From Swiss-Prot:
Pfam families: Queuosine_synth. Its main location: cytoplasm. Monomer. InterPro entries: QueA (IPR003699), QueA_dom1 (IPR042118), QueA_dom2 (IPR042119), QueA_sf (IPR036100). It catalyses: 7-aminomethyl-7-carbaguanosine(34) in tRNA + S-adenosyl-L-methionine = epoxyqueuosine(34) in tRNA + adenine + L-methionine + 2 H(+). Pathway: tRNA modification; tRNA-queuosine biosynthesis. Belongs to the QueA family. This is S-adenosylmethionine:tRNA ribosyltransferase-isomerase. GO terms for cellular component: cytoplasm.
Length: 365
């Protein structure tokens, strides 16, 4: 298939610049015929006793560092205890062996690669890299969140001949809060545990502890795996032949207990619901002859139409970029034609896209 097959027109005003007022107050689109638009807090109405939700419990680290002189780096992947790959902006201002000081701690540029990628080493005094980042770093919000732009403060969205009031989301300043304070909270799932992601597994951002408690009370199970989301998740596909695209690699882990829970549910005919594309990619990467294997590994799995799924029956996910690997994934999961039609409906209904946007619940075709 061609890259252009996965294109669609997305009005820029539908790119969410802020999350909804409350986590579970975002919209949820149920992919049935015709589609059902509801609120996320109603998700329990579309699940049933015995269902198994599989979550990604990776925790977003404060991976963005300001080096001064308008230079920033965004960490990408851990290479060793003190070394990381990163993306620099602008990379041309950096040189190998450049040193940057944060009080009595030091960050050293050790290698320059292509496309703005670099390698850095941390020389720290009595603290870990994660402790250093918690003190000096910032949440690595995606580049399409541009709050200095006029899009930051909309009171309504116009799509075609229709205008929709955005009463459920407003800038942080209207709450008497700062961007930093609230992104630290809202760009993180309530169940995150294991530090390592440099972008949020966004499908999980809608869940509250109250919803998780209600799901448990209804006999809906939950289990957790880990995929540390890398910055490569935002890299565009540049080849018209999609199969020439080289996927980024990401670290994954599935515990023996989690694998046992998933395999037992499958054997009993229970529905497996992957919360997010990161969860689905981890499950499919670990699966052999229908059995999910425990272990820690790296994956560069690239899921496109024609892929034979072995694990999840349903997928909860946000709305994705045109021509992105994630839109290709959902077309593979729920149908190429069906997803194009669903996205047309979502755009007509002025649903919000990307990390801080709305969610959709898909059934495997």
């Amino acid at each position: 298939m061609k890259l252009s097959d996965f294109d669609f027109d997305l009005p820029s005003e539908l790119i969410a610049q802020y999350p909804s007022r409350e986590r579970d107050n975002s919209d949820l689109l149920i992919a049935v015929t015709p589609p059902i638009k509801t609120k996320f807090y109603n998700i329990i109405d579309y699940l049933k006793e015995g269902d198994l939700l599989v979550f990604n419990n990776s925790k977003v680290i404060k991976a963005k560092l300001n080096l001064g002189e308008n230079i920033t780096i965004n960490l990408n992947q851990k290479l060793s205890d003190d070394s990381w790959s990163a993306f620099a902006k602008p990379a041309r201002k950096l040189h190998v062996n450049d040193e940057f000081y944060f009080d009595n701690h030091k960050v050293i540029i050790t290698e320059k690669l292509a496309m703005g990628e670099i390698k850095v080493k941390f020389e720290l005094n009595d603290i870990s890299v994660f402790e250093f980042l918690n003190k000096y770093g910032e949440m690595p919000l995606p580049v399409y969140i541009r709050r200095s732009h006029s899009l930051c403060h909309p009171v309504a969205t116009t799509t075609g001949s229709k205008t929709y009031l955005n009463n459920d989301w407003i800038p942080w300043s209207n709450h008497g809060m700062t961007n930093t304070q609230n992104d630290n909270d809202r760009y993180q799932t309530v169940y995150s545990q294991i530090e390592g992601s440099v972008a949020a597994p966004t499908a999980g951002l809608h869940f509250t502890k109250d919803i998780l408690d209600k799901l448990k009370a209804e006999g809906i199970q939950a289990t957790f795996l880990t995929l540390h989301v890398g910055a490569g998740t935002f890299l565009p596909v540049k080849t018209e032949n999609i199969h020439e695209h080289k996927m980024h690699t990401e670290y994954c882990s599935i515990t023996p207990d989690t694998a046992k829970i998933i395999n037992k549910a499958k054997q009993e005919g229970k529905r497996i619901i992957a919360v997010g594309t990161t969860t689905l990619r981890t499950l499919e990467s670990s699966c052999n002859n229908g059995i999910v294997k425990a272990g820690s590994f790296k994956t560069d799995i690239f899921i496109t139409p024609g892929f034979k799924f072995q694990t999840a029956d349903m997928l909860l996910t946000n709305f994705h970029f045109p021509k992105s690997t994630l839109f290709m994934l959902i077309c593979a999961f729920a149908g190429f034609k069906e997803m194009h039609e669903l996205y047309k409906y979502a755009i007509k209904e002025a649903m919000r896209f990307f990390s801080y946007g709305d969610a959709t619940l898909l059934c495997r075709k």
